[in-house]
Design a protein with these regions (language model features):
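Thr-Gly-centered strand-to-loop micro-motif
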Residues: 9, 165-168
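N-terminal positively charged helical leader segments and presequences
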Residues: 1-38
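Active-site/ligand-binding-proximal alpha/beta "capping" segment
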Residues: 138-159, 163-166
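Short, glycine/polar-rich helix-capping loops at beta-to-alpha or helix-loop-helix junctions
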Residues: 172-177
Length: 193
């Protein structure tokens, strides 16, 4: 870039800066901020993906695609049917790797924020975390009908936080789904089907 050229820089926290190149010094450019504006590229609702740990390296692809599609945060969850069992050391390394993938995917997709990849948690911890959200969806392969789910999705409003639980390849245990339904029986819009 030449002196006097304009560029837009994102800070990863939802802000864009329109800048002009003023000069170059050694190995850096000196920029002047002309305008600061909110990045409008994010979804109107914050989507939290509670993802059951899949086999092999499938989580890398899941993180990449979820971030590209607009997920606000990915929370890896150790469910009963998860084949992958991670000790603390392996889990830490995996989360670091997944976070790097999230950063790359966010840049590639032109996201205004860098979505976080949470620490690997238990299913019970994930349910506790989801209690703070406005809407929780748990797609379940043995559920009957989709009308209630469609209605809940249609009623999601801008600014609401939405948790989506996705099981591992084997899906959720029936008792895991029942446990979630017991926690989320309230007047707020929740779906346990």
């Amino acid at each position: 870039m030449k002196t006097g050229e304009e560029l837009t820089i994102g800070d990863g926290d939802g802000w864009l800066y329109v800048c002009v190149v003023e000069s170059y010094e050694e190995d850096m450019a000196v920029l002047k901020i002309l305008e600061k504006k909110k990045d409008e590229s994010e979804l109107p609702s914050k989507i939290y993906l509670f993802q059951g740990l899949p086999k092999q390296d499938k989580m890398e692809l899941i993180v990449q695609k979820a971030v590209e599609l607009g997920v606000y945060q990915v929370i890896p969850v150790a469910t009963k049917r998860a084949v992958v069992k991670l000790d603390a050391k392996k889990a830490k390394k995996k989360v670091e790797r997944w976070q790097q993938i999230a950063v790359s995917a966010a840049k590639q997709a032109g996201r205004g924020i860098i979505p976080a990849v949470g620490e690997v948690c238990t299913y019970a911890q994930a349910l506790k975390c989801a209690e703070e959200l406005d809407v929780v969806l748990i797609p379940y392969e043995l559920a009957e009908g989709m009308e209630e789910t469609k209605q809940i999705i249609a009623e999601i409003r801008p600014g609401q936080s939405v948790g989506i639980f996705i099981g591992p390849e084997g899906g959720f245990e029936k008792e895991e789904v029942e446990q979630a339904c017991l926690l989320y029986t309230s007047p707020s819009p929740r779906d346990c089907s």
